[in-house]
């Protein structure tokens, strides 16, 4: 079956839309009748159940990468979890009714989709999606894709392997919470250290950190211990390079990077989510939701305001989406 009955897929849907660049509180508007996207041969149409917000969303709204952005108006939202309601003719991995999740944009900063996940329906390339782990709710699944894929790609680039030590800068954030878990449970790190503020140290330990460093009280770069890998998720490579062993690796997702640190931007792949599925299904790797999540669809602007305040611990999720 290639599609749900066409009468059950409307021609328009509710969505949050940005028609100009600026602060999310100024430019994001609710629109009850945006056209539902048409799918290409290698895409599926998803009935969105939950979506998660990411700093890249508000940076995009501010026009930080407008030179490579897709043309306005756009619907924000990179992370999606939902149900397939239609499949393109070349799609082989999914069928109508499948529960899926993923990061809609293969490359975050270059021509991201105009039809993001903050809508009732979105179109997604088959290759960026994975089957939702059965033990995860849609809210939990929506919190994962870009964050857990970024954590995984950085650890691979840093060549973390069993027996090596790693220091995570920003361990309580959306990406950092997954770096700790993957380093410990997937890559087999011998020691995981991570930084956070005082109130978030217990979270680091719960996630598997052997050493929780309070950055408000001590400077990690001054510690006598050095690490095989330093993963910077906050933008402090000038300090990170002082905490790595000679011959070790420093990776960052926030530029500019102080050499020899490596700055990278994620290439999103559903295959990484499929690879991590056993760890998610066994409970070794867990989603980390901000305590304020989920926000209802009517409160998207408030959800962005909270994310932009840098107070979030884990992911900010929007659910239910009508």
UniProtKB/Swiss-Prot annotation:
Q: Where does substrate bind?
A: 59
The enzyme class is oxidoreductase
Catalytic reaction(s) noted: 4-hydroxy-2,5-dimethyl-furan-3(2H)-one + NADP(+) = 4-hydroxy-5-methyl-2-methylenefuran-3(2H)-one + NADPH + H(+)
In this chain, NADP(+) is annotated as bound at: 59, 174-175, 197-200, 215, 253, 264-266, 311-312
| Residues annotated as signal peptide | none
What keywords were assigned to this record?
A: NAD, NADP, Oxidoreductase
Q: Which GO terms describe its molecular function?
A: furaneol oxidoreductase activity; zinc ion binding
Coiled coil (UniProt feature): none
The UniProt record lists the EC number as 1.3.1.105
Q: Which PROSITE patterns does UniProt cross-reference here?
A: QOR_ZETA_CRYSTAL
Can the keyword NADP be found in this entry's annotation?
yes
Annotated PANTHER family: CYTOSOLIC ALKENAL_ONE OXIDOREDUCTASE, NADPH-DEPENDENT ALKENAL/ONE OXIDOREDUCTASE, CHLOROPLASTIC
Protein family: Belongs to the zinc-containing alcohol dehydrogenase family. Quinone oxidoreductase subfamily.
Oligomeric state and interaction partners are given as: Monomer.
UniProt function note: Enone oxidoreductase involved in the biosynthesis of 4-hydroxy-2,5-dimethyl-3(2H)-furanone (HDMF or furaneol), the key flavor compound in strawberries.
Task: Indicate what this protein is called per its UniProt record.
Answer: 2-methylene-furan-3-one reductase
